[in-house]
Amino acid sequence: MITQQPTQSDQFKEQMQGSLLNETKHSSAIKIGKHNHVYTAGDEHETVYFIEKGQIKLVMVSEEGKECMLAIHGAGDVFGELCLSGLGGRLETATAMEDTSLKEIPCARFLERLAKDSLLEGFIKYLTVRVADQQQVIANLVTVDSEQRLGKTLLQIAKKLGKKDPRSIRIEVRISHEELAAMVGTTRPRISVFMQRFRNLDLIEYNTEHHLIIKEHKLTAYLASIL
């Protein structure tokens, strides 16, 4: 059986989740249908969002129309926290990957709640982990080839959104090859080639419900072998 001890970031996320559930218990949830936007780049940003159920992807689009997927967030996550920066409008577009239920919290109220529950210091540390993750993604774009970036991306998604099975991690959210290409920084055809290679090497598979199964130890060992 694969076991994993909760990290400080995981523990803080649980504390923040409880705090925000208390803060929003009397407010109605916002229902966002699959493929619909929560907000788009350029919108005013005065609120943070807390995900009750579902998945949200954050995407930035270049002037040439090329998409870069920044992150995928699931139940218990917050997003839209750049409203705390005092910058102009939203820099990214937030889109539901499946039917999603959200709670909306004004930025000032969000900070007040964290302060009330003595979670501000933890929130700063939580954000630094996100920054470190993004720095690693940027470094990988320069130092790691596309196949390795895909493997690392699959492992990151599995860690964040997957469900543990005895010898693998199951990803139930549907992520298209086009979306993976936007995360990895390559083309959809190349993603298809690499995914087929991973399947042939028994590093990943799809179950009868079409969920992606990541064989964590095998994939990690393979990535180490091709450095």
Language-model features, listed with the residues they occupy:
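Cyclic nucleotide-binding regulatory module and flanking cytosolic helices
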Residues: 1-37, 78-79, 83-86, 116
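Short phosphate-coordinating micro-motif centered on Lys-Gly-acidic
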Residues: 38-43
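Glycine- and acidic-residue-biased ligand/ion/polar-headgroup-sensing regions
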Residues: 35, 46-59, 74-76
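Phosphate-/nucleic-acid-contacting segments
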Residues: 159-227
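Polybasic "coupling" helices that flank or enter modular domains
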Residues: 118-185
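Structural motif
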Residues: 55, 99-101, 210-211
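Cyclic-nucleotide recognition modules
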Residues: 20, 25, 71-132
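Cytochrome P450 core scaffold surrounding the K-helix E-X-X-R motif
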Residues: 59-65
